[in-house]
């Protein structure tokens, strides 16, 4: 079967992009991406292959490489350990992915592949992600990061397939195609909606015009009604 996979975006940027396209429908993908900066994942993270985004939006297909965002917290006292803190994660890790990642990191520590890590704790809460790795003195932080990206889901890919139904058939659309189809859909729906409203208002207008006409010759109408034998004659 076929399934669509469109990354989430910032709503404000999406609206601005639609408005820009309405004003200048000849805009190319690169120009549109000056307004729509790219995907905006709710879990944050780093897009490691930003240079490939124009091609992805031009074709409607591709893979976005996501990396966790890490920060180094230096110990405040000599006895304190430095920490490597994960504050944002790839979108693909939401849900059970965090626990799986913690388990994978623990396995790497146990197998001595992350020998410079002495403790792992998940301090995440409703305020955000916070996974803390306590480090040995003089730990090679860059090496630790590279191992984490290579051996765990802290680096992952999001497959893009901007598939949509157009004219009753599935079609992979690029960014301009999505914008055009969205605006065509809105135009068609709103035209149909306001046509129905217009017809209802025209019916009301005819009734009101009839009442106004009746008021202008009310005496004649009363005389006709009084002189009629029944409702059929009155009509």
Predicted regions: what is each one?
Residues 60-62, 78, 125-127:
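Solvent-exposed loop and beta-edge segments used for protein-protein assembly and interaction
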Residues 52, 66-70, 78, 82-90:
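Conserved catalytic-core segments of large NTP-driven translation/proteostasis enzymes
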Residues 13-21, 35, 100-104, 143-147, ...:
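Alpha-helical scaffold elements adjacent to nucleotide-binding pockets in ATP/GTP-utilizing enzyme cores
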Residues 20, 24, 107-114, 150:
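Conserved helix-loop functional segments at active or binding sites
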Residues 92-115:
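A short, contiguous, amphipathic alpha-helix enriched in charged residues
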Residues 62-73, 110-119:
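Short amphipathic beta-strand starts and helix->beta connectors
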Residues 2-65, 96-99:
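Conserved glycine-bearing catalytic or ligand-binding loops at nucleotide- and phosphate-handling centers
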Residues 40, 81, 90-94, 114-235:
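Long, charged, helix-rich clamp/arm modules that form nucleic acid-engaging surfaces
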């Amino acid at each position: 079967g076929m399934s669509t996979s469109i990354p989430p975006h910032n709503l404000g940027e999406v609206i601005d992009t639609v408005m820009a396209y309405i004003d200048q429908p000849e805009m190319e993908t690169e120009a549109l991406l000056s307004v729509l900066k790219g995907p905006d994942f709710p879990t944050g993270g780093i897009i490691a292959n930003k240079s490939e985004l124009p091609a992805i939006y031009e074709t409607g297909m591709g893979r976005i490489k996501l990396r966790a965002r890490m920060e180094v917290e230096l110990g405040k006292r000599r006895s304190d350990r430095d920490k490597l803190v994960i504050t944002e994660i790839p979108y693909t890790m939401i849900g059970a992915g965090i626990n799986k990642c913690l388990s994978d990191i623990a396995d790497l520590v146990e197998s001595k592949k992350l020998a410079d890590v002495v403790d792992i704790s998940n301090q995440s809460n409703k305020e955000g992600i916070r996974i803390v790795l306590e480090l040995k003195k003089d730990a090679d932080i860059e090496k630790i990061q590279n191992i984490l990206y290579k051996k765990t889901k802290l680096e992952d890919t999001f497959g893009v397939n901007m598939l949509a139904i157009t004219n009753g058939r599935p079609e992979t659309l690029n960014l301009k195609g999505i914008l055009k189809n969205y605006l065509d859909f809105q135009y068609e729906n709103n035209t149909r909606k306001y046509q129905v409203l217009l017809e209802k208002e025209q019916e009301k207008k005819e009734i009101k015009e009839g009442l106004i006409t009746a008021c202008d010759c009310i005496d004649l109408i009363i005389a006709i009604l009084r002189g009629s034998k029944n409702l059929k004659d009155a009509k």
